[in-house]
Regions:
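Non-globular, low-confidence helical/coil segments that flank catalytic cores
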Residues: 1-282
Length: 282
């Protein structure tokens, strides 16, 4: 964020593990247990689910919210289990691409989310949600959603779908500004800055859109927002060339620290008393 934003305490995986004291490996996998949200605080987990997006919002004392579910076979259940999730209060789908909604089918029956928040969603997912007792709720620009002490303002897309002239589903992706006290993080889905006119003000964290693909609008967004940390959910050895070298260059030139799930594993932002803290899974 701006110069008056919270300071950062970067943590290596080793330091994070030492702080948590007890580290458990789940049977059959290499996911470590994620810590609990601080009392009165929250954790934001950018989950390592391969080539796809899944972000877990974990406010203290209320059931968490899952933003996207990653691709089919991305082990979203293992990721949620590593966070000790039993139930979800909601799942938010940013847009109807398989690497964002594929894992949601696995989530619906097991974690019993109350609501599926969406702007555009495949009919079979809406049907599966209703069958599981999850209520689909349409959201769009101007809506504000509270999750415990976390609040998300929906910045994109407009309620009038005709206002989005691009047919690419990415251009309809939900973009949300996540706030907790003075902490501010932009969740972009796959809406590249060149597609969605965004001016959210200073940011602490940017979730980089579309797995770090080339984005001509990114330098302008970075100039307007000055994020201290940029997190890229991306699959190791993916065939798309993500993240693009130009995106990494733009982020570096803006002075943003870069973390990426293919190299760093799950990226956790811990919000409590004192400055936000960052933990990585590797």
């Amino acid at each position: 964020g701006g110069t008056d934003g919270p300071g950062w305490i970067p943590m290596s995986a080793v330091a994070a593990v030492a702080l948590l004291a007890a580290v458990l490996l789940l049977g059959g996998g290499d996911r470590r247990e994620l810590g609990s949200p601080p009392p009165g605080g929250a954790r934001i987990e950018v989950l390592d689910v391969g080539q796809g997006d899944a972000i877990l919002l974990r406010p203290d004392a209320v059931d968490p919210v899952l933003v996207d579910g990653g691709p089919p076979g991305g082990d979203i259940e293992g990721a949620l289990d590593s966070a000790g999730v039993d139930d979800l209060s909601a799942v938010l789908l940013t847009h109807e691409h398989l690497d964002h909604f594929g894992g949601i089918f696995d989530v619906l029956g097991r974690y019993d989310p109350d609501r599926l928040l969406y702007d555009q969603a495949p009919p079979d997912l809406l049907s599966a949600a209703r069958s599981a007792g999850t209520v689909p709720v349409r959201i769009s620009q101007g809506d504000t959603i509270g999750f415990g002490d976390l609040e998300m303002e929906i910045l994109w897309p407009p309620a009038d779908a005709a206002a989005v002239t691009d047919d690419d589903p990415n251009s309809h992706s939900i973009v949300g500004l996540l706030e907790w006290r003075r902490f501010r993080m932009l969740l972009t889905g796959d809406a590249e800055a060149g597609m969605a006119p965004l001016d959210p003000g200073p940011l602490d964290v940017l979730k980089v859109a579309h797995h770090g693909s080339d984005d001509t609008g990114l330098p302008g967004l970075l100039a307007r927002t000055s994020p201290r940390l940029a997190v890229i959910p991306v699959g190791e050895g993916n065939t798309y060339g993500h993240p693009d070298a130009s995106t990494l260059d733009d982020l570096g030139a803006a002075g943003s620290r870069i973390l990426r799930t293919d190299e760093d594993g799950t990226v956790s932002i811990v919000l409590g008393d004192g400055p936000p803290r960052v933990e990585t899974g590797r």
